């Protein structure tokens, strides 16, 4: 007999309304952040919608992001933006604070925070100018 899977993180969190609140909390922090705000367009609403769709899909809320925007391709979609280690860390800090602020139960908060920690470094696409070029010969 096969085991019936339990509820998804999406369901445990409270569905789309919970992810919309999370995204609103995150973008409120971005709005006031001197490092990250310049990387975003003046109108934050489309980005909020897209992030909400992405998170909902990733955590088990159906194919809403893919249905609207195609495959997520995170690295490709973020390639135009200079994401330094400092910017990535700030993004992770703001997202983690937004997650914790929601008061999710541990079975929701833990995987969300683990995802942020795991995914954030993969989006770094620009090193600071003071980093030695490791491709240069001796």
Residue ranges and their predicted role:
Residues 1-138:
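Core of compact, soluble alpha-helical bundle domains
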């Amino acid at each position: 007999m096969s085991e019936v899977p339990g509820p998804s993180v999406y369901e445990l969190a409270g569905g789309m309304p919970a992810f919309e609140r999370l995204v609103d909390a995150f973008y409120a922090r971005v709005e006031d952040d001197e490092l990250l705000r310049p990387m975003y367009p003046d109108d934050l609403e489309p980005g909020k919608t897209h992030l909400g769709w992405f998170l909902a899909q990733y955590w088990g809320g159906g194919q809403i992001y893919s249905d609207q925007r195609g495959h997520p391709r995170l690295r490709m979609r973020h390639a135009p933006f200079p994401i330094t280690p400092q910017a990535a860390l700030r993004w992770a800090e703001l997202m983690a604070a937004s997650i914790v602020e929601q008061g999710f139960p541990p079975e929701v908060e833990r995987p969300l925070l683990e995802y942020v920690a795991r995914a954030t470094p993969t989006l770094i696409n620009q090193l600071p100018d003071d980093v030695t070029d490791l491709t240069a010969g001796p």
